[in-house]
Curated annotation (Swiss-Prot):
Keyword line: Antibiotic resistance, Cytoplasm, Magnesium, Metal-binding, Transferase
Gene: fosB
Functional summary from the UniProt entry: Metallothiol transferase which confers resistance to fosfomycin by catalyzing the addition of a thiol cofactor to fosfomycin. L-cysteine is probably the physiological thiol donor.
Residues annotated for Mg(2+) binding in this entry: H8, H67, E116
GO biological process: response to antibiotic
Signal peptide: none
Primary localisation category: cytoplasm
Protein name as it appears in the record: Metallothiol transferase FosB
EC number: 2.5.1.-
Example of a GO MF term: transferase activity, transferring alkyl or aryl (other than methyl) groups
PANTHER family registered for this protein in UniProt: FOSFOMYCIN RESISTANCE PROTEIN FOSX, LYASE, PUTATIVE-RELATED-RELATED
InterPro entries attached to this UniProt entry: Fosfomycin_Res_Enzymes, Glyas_Bleomycin-R_OHBP_Dase, Glyas_Fos-R_dOase_dom, Metallothiol_Trafse_FosB, VOC
Quaternary context: Homodimer.
Subcellular location: Cytoplasm
Length: 140
């Protein structure tokens, strides 16, 4: 069996209009369709879906490190963080990191889904870990 790339991302939201505004303004997502309880976007070739669900627990996952990270260019990072602040986005305290691990900002959408904008790549991370994390086992 061969699995392809990610097909789509779906998030349960409590307020469709508020969430549409968030994803358009924070991510620059292009709204493709909007129904009573759903919205679909194109996010740089990723199918992003929002589905309204009112009565579900929303706070538990916020306490974990579970998140989705998107790449941003190093030269755009400060501007991206400033834009999040201007939009009133809930920015989370970041974890301490070595500069070789590049830069990140963590934030949530209106329903608490956690995201990260990160300037590094997987190769950056592996290179850093190989030089510093001698307890780790690496595979080809």
């Amino acid at each position: 069996m061969r699995i392809g790339g990610i097909n789509h991302l779906t998030f349960s939201v409590s307020d469709l209009e508020k969430s549409i505004h968030f994803y358009q303004n924070v991510f620059g997502a292009k709204l493709l369709v909007k129904g009573r309880n759903l919205a679909y976007f194109d996010l740089n070739g990723i199918w992003l879906a929002l589905n309204v669900q009112q009565d579900i627990p929303r706070n538990d996952i916020q306490h974990s490190y579970t998140h989705i990270a998107f790449s941003v260019k190093e030269e755009d990072f400060d501007h991206v963080v400033e834009k999040l602040k201007e939009l009133g986005v809930n920015i989370l305290p970041g974890r301490e990191r070595d500069e070789r691990d590049k830069r990140s900002v963590y934030f949530t959408d209106p329903d608490g889904h956690k995201f990260e904008f990160h300037t590094g790549t997987l190769n950056d991370r592996l290179s850093y870990y190989k030089s510093e994390m001698h307890h780790m086992q690496f595979f080809d």
